């Protein structure tokens, strides 16, 4: 797919990188692996009716690092036609050697989910940076990272698995910790994240 004109007209490159070789901007998420990461239906909907995923400005912003985070500005909205062309283009952007089919979409059992919740909240402290839901559906957690509520509609499971295992592969500088996760633990946390949704 050729790069759509809307990417230039809407100033997408002011906030996003479309290639690993471009300078890291720290304003919005990188898009050079969007095809590995994002689901098409969600992407089309987001581009036409943007919602807030990260409540504060990108975590490498200097104001964030000294304790004065700024709220994110609303994302620009595209027409349906623009969104379709842009999403088709973005989904062609992939890393050449990212292993797929690491995670199936079979949900965790009740017992496995309880164990994964302990890993997510206590062992690895993911809740310190990410919005999630408690047992009665109330929002809780930090805001320095993107919200994980309903993230299964947005993200592909294999990408989440690889992000948990090797975040530096996607972002050389950032606040995401590098954990020494075995595959089973990474899969379990990925599935737990995909179960954080407002309509179980």
Feature map (PLM): residue ranges:
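Sequence context of c-type cytochrome heme-c attachment sites
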Residues: 1-5, 17, 26-30, 60-77
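Sequence/structural segment immediately N-terminal to covalent heme-attachment motifs in c-type
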Residues: 1-19, 107-134
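Gly/Gly-Pro-rich "capping" loops immediately C-terminal to redox-active cysteine motifs
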Residues: 13, 17-46, 60-62, 131-162
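Sec-exported extracytoplasmic/periplasmic mature domains
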Residues: 17-20, 36, 48-52, 91-95, ...
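General marker for long, soluble alpha-helical cores
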Residues: 37, 97-100, 104-106, 147
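C-terminal capping alpha-helices of c-type cytochrome domains
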Residues: 68-101, 177-200
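Structured core of small recognition/catalytic domains
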Residues: 134-135, 140-200
């Amino acid at each position: 797919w050729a790069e759509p004109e809307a990417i230039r007209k809407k100033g997408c490159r002011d906030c996003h990188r479309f290639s690993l070789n471009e300078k890291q901007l720290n304003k919005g998420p990188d898009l050079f692996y969007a095809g590995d990461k994002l689901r098409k239906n969600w992407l089309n909907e987001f581009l036409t009716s943007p919602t807030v995923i990260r409540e504060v400005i990108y975590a490498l912003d200097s104001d964030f690092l000294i304790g004065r985070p700024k709220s994110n500005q609303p994302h620009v909205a595209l027409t349906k036609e623009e969104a379709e062309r842009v999403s088709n283009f973005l989904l062609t952007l992939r890393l050449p050697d990212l292993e797929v089919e690491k995670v199936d979409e079979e949900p965790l059992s009740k017992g496995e989910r309880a164990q994964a919740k302990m890993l997510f909240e206590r062992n690895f402290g993911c809740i310190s940076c990410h919005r999630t839901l408690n047992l009665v559906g109330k929002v809780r957690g930090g805001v320095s990272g993107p919200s994980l509520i309903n993230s299964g509609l947005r993200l592909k499971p294999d990408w989440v698995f690889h992000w948990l295992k090797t975040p530096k592969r996607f972002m050389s500088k950032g606040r995401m910790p590098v954990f020494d996760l075995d595959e089973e633990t990474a899969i379990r946390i990925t599935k737990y994240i995909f179960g954080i949704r407002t309509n179980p």
